[in-house]
Amino acid sequence: MLIPKENRKAIHQALFQQGVLVAKKDFNLPKHPEVGVPNLQVIKACQSLDSRGYLKTRYNWGWFYYTLTNEGVEYLREYLHLPAEVVPATHKRQVRPAAPRAGRPEPRERSSAADAGYRRAEKKDDGAAPGGFAPSFRGGFGRPVAA
């Protein structure tokens, strides 16, 4: 499919910025909500990149999910004339706040009286079979009883 150069560049820029792109499987959608070009052109451009191994495509519930591969990052970096320091958002490490170094919390003191009822509860025999119960199989319906 012939895609104008400015539309192809807009698709590649949006893909490189985030590292992922989502497109609804609606070929008649006039504009892709994120890129601003016809949705059919977005799908076909991503199909082209996928066939060359620069994207991975997943399809689920009427949506295409495109993710860049390492080869795709290199290709788009060359296509868009970007320096090597620029990477997609999915390839950046997220800075997480450091965990507090307070150490282990002190264990709570337990009162033996509070736990005694829980730990050593008397056995309840409500609904249990009596001690002398001996189950036996007597055959099914219409079968002779073996003695």
UniProtKB/Swiss-Prot annotation:
<comment type="similarity">
    <text>Belongs to the eukaryotic ribosomal protein eS10 family.</text>
</comment>
<dbReference type="GO" id="GO:0002181">
    <property type="term" value="P:cytoplasmic translation"/>
</dbReference>
<comment type="function">
    <text>Component of the ribosome, a large ribonucleoprotein complex responsible for the synthesis of proteins in the cell. The small ribosomal subunit (SSU) binds messenger RNAs (mRNAs) and translates the encoded message by selecting cognate aminoacyl-transfer RNA (tRNA) molecules. The large subunit (LSU) contains the ribosomal catalytic site termed the peptidyl transferase center (PTC), which catalyzes the formation of peptide bonds, thereby polymerizing the amino acids delivered by tRNAs into a polypeptide chain.</text>
</comment>
<dbReference type="InterPro" id="IPR037447">
    <property type="entry name" value="Ribosomal_eS10"/>
</dbReference>
<dbReference type="InterPro" id="IPR005326">
    <property type="entry name" value="Plectin_eS10_N"/>
</dbReference>
<dbReference type="GO" id="GO:0022627">
    <property type="term" value="C:cytosolic small ribosomal subunit"/>
</dbReference>
<feature type="region of interest" description="Disordered">
    <location>
        <begin position="90"/>
        <end position="147"/>
    </location>
</feature>
<protein>
    <recommendedName>
        <fullName>Small ribosomal subunit protein eS10B</fullName>
    </recommendedName>
</protein>
<dbReference type="Pfam" id="PF03501">
    <property type="entry name" value="S10_plectin"/>
</dbReference>
<dbReference type="GO" id="GO:0003735">
    <property type="term" value="F:structural constituent of ribosome"/>
</dbReference>
<dbReference type="InterPro" id="IPR036388">
    <property type="entry name" value="WH-like_DNA-bd_sf"/>
</dbReference>
<dbReference type="GO" id="GO:0003723">
    <property type="term" value="F:RNA binding"/>
</dbReference>
<keyword id="KW-0687">Ribonucleoprotein</keyword>
<keyword id="KW-0963">Cytoplasm</keyword>
<comment type="subunit">
    <text>Component of the small ribosomal subunit (SSU). Mature yeast ribosomes consist of a small (40S) and a large (60S) subunit. The 40S small subunit contains 1 molecule of ribosomal RNA (18S rRNA) and at least 33 different proteins. The large 60S subunit contains 3 rRNA molecules (25S, 5.8S and 5S rRNA) and at least 46 different proteins. eS10 interacts with GCN1 (via middle region); this interaction is direct and promotes GCN2 kinase activity.</text>
</comment>
<keyword id="KW-0689">Ribosomal protein</keyword>
<feature type="compositionally biased region" description="Basic and acidic residues">
    <location>
        <begin position="103"/>
        <end position="127"/>
    </location>
</feature>
<dbReference type="GO" id="GO:0005829">
    <property type="term" value="C:cytosol"/>
</dbReference>
